[in-house]
């Protein structure tokens, strides 16, 4: 099997390492955008920037520059870039015969100056717009790159309307330390992956303000309800949100110390500005960029998402950390 992973960030590198470690004669190529990074990875045998101290498998090829030859020979192409770069890559890959999957979680940002009715698209909607004939899907679920790179047990979900894509993802990544489940509900899987990042900012805020475990549990539970409401309005299946890409990913991202989105909430609770919080991460926290587009989509569908709305007001500077909590607690009582 010939696998190409585009993007040598933490997640792209970790999955490429997982695939290359299988040792069954497969060819795994990791494409890095930055030439210096690619050379440093080859020289040191590790991705010192994103996964320091974790050795790359000898079978993993790290390349830079011309990629067309690798793409033409691929049996599976995985896009490991942030959401902001997905549209460009899908356009470039629109005519490849191999299945294509992405790893990013979120909604595409609404361009500056767009109309009030504009809303961000999910990745599969971007693909339908840019590359409608592409065999495409997503690999998602509760996972921190550092644990995958160290071959710690992980379960993921491959989601696509095309069985060939799910089959390729299972063949590429299912192994001793990783289980990959197939799901045809790509809408539900992508909604879960996008909304959980926003909710994790809220739980980070809660933890940073030392509001206690009761408050965190309430945010996770009510956040799951928000996620499900939006997903159902978009055509997802209810059961998807009780699976790996819904509840599973939400619990991990909302509670795990490796969560970038939770870290943003923690830093805001400490009095940092959003700019300071994002700069201190050194990595992309998709929830910061997805929150506004998630809320815009919900409003177009008349879906109530009070936690998401509060996070957006916090990120926009219209609420301070303590005010955000008061804002949620002051809502009128209602049935669960």
Curated annotation (Swiss-Prot):
It holds the Pfam family NAD_Gly3P_dh_C. It is found in: Cytoplasm. Keywords: Cytoplasm, Lipid biosynthesis, Lipid metabolism, NAD, NADP, Nucleotide-binding, Oxidoreductase, Phospholipid biosynthesis, Phospholipid metabolism. It catalyses: sn-glycerol 3-phosphate + NAD(+) = dihydroxyacetone phosphate + NADH + H(+); sn-glycerol 3-phosphate + NADP(+) = dihydroxyacetone phosphate + NADPH + H(+). The keyword Transmembrane helix does not apply. PANTHER family: GLYCEROL-3-PHOSPHATE DEHYDROGENASE, GLYCEROL-3-PHOSPHATE DEHYDROGENASE [NAD(+)] 2, CHLOROPLASTIC. This is Glycerol-3-phosphate dehydrogenase [NAD(P)+]. It comes from Delftia acidovorans (strain DSM 14801 / SPH-1).
């Amino acid at each position: 099997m010939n696998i190409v992973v585009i993007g040598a960030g933490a997640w792209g590198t970790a999955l490429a390492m997982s695939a290359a470690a299988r040792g069954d004669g497969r060819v795994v190529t990791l494409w890095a955008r930055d030439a210096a990074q690619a050379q440093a990875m080859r020289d040191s045998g590790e991705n010192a920037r994103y996964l320091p101290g974790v050795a790359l498998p000898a079978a993993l090829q790290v390349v830079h520059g011309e990629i067309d030859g690798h793409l033409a020979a691929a049996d599976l192409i995985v896009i490991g870039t942030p959401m902001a770069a997905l549209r460009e890559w899908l356009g470039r890959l629109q005519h490849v015969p191999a299945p294509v999957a992405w790893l990013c979680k979120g909604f595409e940002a609404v361009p500056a100056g767009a109309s009030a009715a504009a809303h961000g698209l999910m990745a599969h909607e971007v693909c339908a717009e840019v590359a409608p004939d592409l065999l495409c899907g997503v690999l998602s679920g509760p996972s921190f790159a550092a644990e995958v790179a160290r071959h710690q047990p992980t379960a993921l979900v491959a989601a696509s309307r095309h069985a060939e894509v799910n089959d390729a993802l299972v063949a590429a990544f299912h192994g001793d330390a990783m289980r990959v489940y197939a799901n045809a509900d790509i809408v539900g899987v992508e909604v879960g992956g996008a909304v959980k990042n926003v909710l994790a900012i809220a739980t980070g805020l809660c933890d940073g303000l030392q509001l206690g475990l009761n408050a965190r549990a309430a945010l996770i539970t009510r956040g799951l309800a928000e996620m499900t409401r939006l997903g159902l309005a978009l055509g997802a299946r209810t059961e998807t949100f009780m699976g790996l890409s819904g509840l599973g990913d939400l619990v991990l991202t909302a509670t795990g110390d490796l969560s970038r989105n939770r870290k943003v909430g923690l830093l805001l609770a400490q009095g940092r500005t959003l700019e300071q919080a994002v700069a201190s991460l050194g990595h992309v926290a998709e929830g910061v960029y997805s929150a506004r587009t998630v809320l815009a989509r919900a409003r177009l569908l008349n879906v109530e998402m009070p936690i998401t709305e509060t996070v957006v007001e916090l990120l926009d500077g219209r609420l301070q950390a303590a005010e955000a909590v008061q804002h949620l607690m002051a809502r009128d009582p209602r049935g669960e």
